[in-house]
């Protein structure tokens, strides 16, 4: 299982090369308040002085420290290959292959790199420094040294320095694959430990938190850390380990880490003999190594899955970016053809990318025809906007100066044309809706079907312009045709239409039935000449003509109907003087039986004929729109695009990639290469390494 930590280090190196943190790798994050001894603990684990030391804020950038254990045989081999003279050496990621054998030089490089990014005062940065230490005296570990938690800004630190440091710490410890090393000084109250507090925010159960108590030798006289080290004060599931740091005086006197560890062991044996074997720097190193190995083992399956998923995603992304253009003519023709095909397929419903959130393309056009347009027509009232006064006025105006003996046919035509004209507006609105949907299909194809177009924004804009122009040209042609469909219906009122003749026949039968009912109700003393007159009317009505039908209705003056209250233009009643220069004024009175009958007949005929015309329009308008707009655009789109865009003079301009496309392609290629390498690294892990 020791082989797992080098594997994770390899993965970290792989992803560091592309500057990505999309994979959350197992690591140990060191958290603590400022000057609590975090860096001292890390130096004890390394066994060398390599970190900047001092008072105040010293660690101002995250330091990712990879400790790599090397055997003597491997060390000799590496020394020969790299020309390294020494058993321990370090490498920074930002200095590439440069090898440092002087640890003072490593410390100076950390300070220089920190100041380069964070400034030479007290500011912080979240950009990490990557350092790898090779030594036979270390165990395999990956640790992250983080800036200490502080409260008050100093130097050129911003006022929200506490919040910045907190967010930086949370960024690392929120990683569910990280172990939190919470460092607290023994000469402070554990109940007020900021490190444990912030660790508990992201790990409330303490499943991945290990507490370290530093400065055991600096506790007040007469006190000890027995209860704390036994876990009686703050219980932590992964354990609690005490260590002794070097003092600033020891550092000034050049006391080595090895001597410090030896003195630490002596102090623990003297002060805490029963706990000495479960505390100290060496025990901490072994514990961290064991915890990290088990943690990596638990995280590995999910890590494999994540890398495989990301590989597939970046492969798809790279494919969508396409290869650099070599043959411009072929590429342009291919993109134009693909767009035209996808546009037509979206209308036909055979597109590769089917929208699931809403209707689009041909399905939406169908919805417009049969739901939107169909329901709008059905909601148009055949007699809407037509009152009894309008009907009677039309009848009177149609007779001119002569009194009407029968209902004039001209009044029917006049009124029915007025009603049919109302179908034109929803028909033209239907054309507009289909036109808008065909515009939307352009964007749909750009977003879902032909992502290659996004590589070439000028080509995309040119295609949109050509298709929009084609649709714009077809719109007036289609509108004209739809207008003509309504005009055709208005041009000739066909009263011999089979459906209309049936309606007239039914009306004849209805009026005849009403007349017979009235005849039965007449008193027996009715004179014979009236009876004969009725028979004569029946004979005249039997011809089946419109005039005969209306004449039959004229006999029904005795029929009991609801008397409509209305105002009609009428002559002044007898007995009153009239100024002939006055305009006739409406007079409120009850309609006569004949006026009621005339209105009813005209209204029934209008309704019957209107329904016939509405049915025709509901059928013919979608056909006209399909022929003159949809199908015409489908058939001519390819040739229109080729004719407008496939020109040698336009090739260079149209196939100019967007500024960031080449960069994004390179980034995606680098990331894919890193993921493939990471997948290869994980694949090398033998199952025996896991146990």
UniProtKB/Swiss-Prot annotation:
Residues 522-573 are annotated as: Disordered. It is an enzyme of class 3 (hydrolase). Residues 522-531, 551-563 have a biased composition (Basic and acidic residues). Residues 599-690 form the GED domain. It catalyses: GTP + H2O = GDP + phosphate + H(+). Homotetramer; dimerizes through the N-terminal GTP-middle region of one molecule binding to the GED domain of another DNM1L molecule. Oligomerizes in a GTP-dependent manner to form membrane-associated tubules with a spiral pattern. Functions in mitochondrial and peroxisomal division. Mediates membrane fission through oligomerization into membrane-associated tubular structures that wrap around the scission site to constrict and sever the mitochondrial membrane through a GTP hydrolysis-dependent mechanism. The specific recruitment at scission sites is mediated by membrane receptors like MFF, MIEF1 and MIEF2 for mitochondrial membranes. This is Dynamin-1-like protein. It comes from Danio rerio (Zebrafish).
């Amino acid at each position: 299982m020791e082989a797992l930590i080098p594997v994770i280090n390899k993965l970290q190196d792989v992803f560091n090369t592309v500057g990505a943190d999309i994979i959350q790798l197992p690591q140990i994050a060191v958290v603590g308040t400022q000057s609590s001894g975090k860096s001292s603990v890390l130096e004890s684990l390394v066994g060398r002085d390599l970190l900047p030391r001092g008072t105040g804020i010293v660690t101002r950038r995250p330091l990712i420290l990879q400790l790599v254990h090397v055997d003597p045989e491997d060390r000799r081999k590496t020394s020969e290959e790299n020309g390294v003279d020494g058993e321990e050496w370090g490498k920074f990621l930002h200095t590439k292959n440069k090898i440092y054998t002087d640890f003072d030089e490593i410390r100076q490089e950390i300070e220089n790199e920190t100041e380069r990014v964070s400034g030479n005062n007290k500011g912080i940065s979240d950009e990490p420094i990557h350092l790898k230490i090779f030594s036979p005296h270390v165990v395999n570990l990956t640790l992250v040294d983080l800036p200490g938690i502080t409260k008050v800004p100093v130097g050129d630190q911003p006022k929200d320095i506490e919040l910045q440091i907190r967010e930086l710490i949370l960024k690392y410890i929120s990683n569910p694959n990280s172990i939190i090393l919470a460092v607290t000084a023994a000469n402070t109250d554990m109940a007020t430990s900021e490190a444990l507090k912030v660790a508990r925010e992201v790990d409330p159960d303490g499943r991945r938190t290990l507490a370290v108590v530093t400065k055991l030798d600096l506790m007040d006289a007469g006190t000890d850390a027995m209860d704390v080290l036994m876990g009686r004060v703050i219980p932590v599931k992964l354990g609690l380990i005490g260590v002794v740091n070097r003092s600033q005086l020891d550092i000034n006197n050049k006391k080595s880490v090895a001597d410090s560890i030896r003195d630490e062991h002596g102090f623990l044996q003297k002060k805490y003999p029963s706990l000495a074997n479960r505390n100290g720097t060496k025990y901490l190193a072994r514990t961290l190594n064991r915890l990290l190995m088990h943690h990596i083992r638990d995280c590995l399956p999910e890590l494999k899955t994540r890398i495989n998923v990301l590989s597939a995603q970046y492969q798809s992304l790279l494919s969508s970016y396409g290869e650099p253009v070599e043959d411009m003519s072929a590429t342009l023709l291919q993109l134009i053809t693909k767009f035209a095909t996808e546009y037509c397929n979206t209308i036909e419903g055979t597109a590769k990318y089917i929208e699931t959130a809403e209707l689009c393309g041909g399905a939406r056009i169908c919805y417009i025809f049969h739901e939107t347009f169909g329901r709008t027509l059905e909601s148009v009232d055949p007699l809407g906007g037509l009152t009894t006064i309008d009907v009677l006025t039309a009848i009177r105006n149609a007779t001119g100066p002569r009194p009407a003996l029968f209902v004039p046919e001209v009044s029917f035509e006049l009124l029915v044309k007025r009603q049919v004209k109302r179908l034109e507006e929803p028909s033209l609105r239907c054309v507009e809706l289909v036109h808008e949907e065909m515009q939307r299909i352009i964007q749909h194809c750009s977003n879902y079907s032909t992502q290659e177009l996004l590589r070439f924004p000028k080509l995309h804009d040119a295609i949109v312009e050509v298709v929009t122009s084609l649709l714009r040209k077809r719109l007036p042609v289609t509108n004209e045709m739809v207008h003509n469909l309504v005009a055709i219906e208005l041009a000739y009122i066909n009263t011999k239409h089979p459906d209309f003749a049936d309606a007239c026949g039914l009306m004849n039968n209805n009026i005849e039935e009403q007349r017979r009912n009235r005849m039965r109700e007449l008193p027996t003393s009715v004179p014979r000449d009236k009876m004969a007159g009725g028979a004569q009317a029946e004979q005249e009505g039997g011809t089946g003509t419109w005039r005969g039908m209306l004449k039959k209705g004229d006999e029904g003056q005795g029929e009991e109907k609801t008397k409509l209250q209305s105002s009609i233009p009428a002559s002044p009643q007898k007995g009153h003087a009239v100024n002939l220069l006055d305009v006739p004024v409406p007079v409120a009175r009850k309609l006569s039986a004949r006026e009621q009958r005339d209105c009813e007949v005209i209204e029934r005929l209008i309704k019957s004929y209107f329904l016939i015309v509405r049915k025709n329009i509901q059928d013919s308008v979608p056909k006209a729109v399909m022929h003159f707009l949809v199908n015409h655009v489908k058939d001519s789109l390819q040739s229109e695009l080729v004719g407008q865009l496939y020109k040698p003079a336009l090739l260079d301009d149209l196939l100019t990639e967007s500024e960031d496309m080449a960069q994004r392609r390179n980034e995606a290629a680098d990331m894919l290469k890193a993921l493939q390498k990471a997948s290869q690294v994980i694949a090398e892990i033998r199952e025996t390494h896991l146990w």
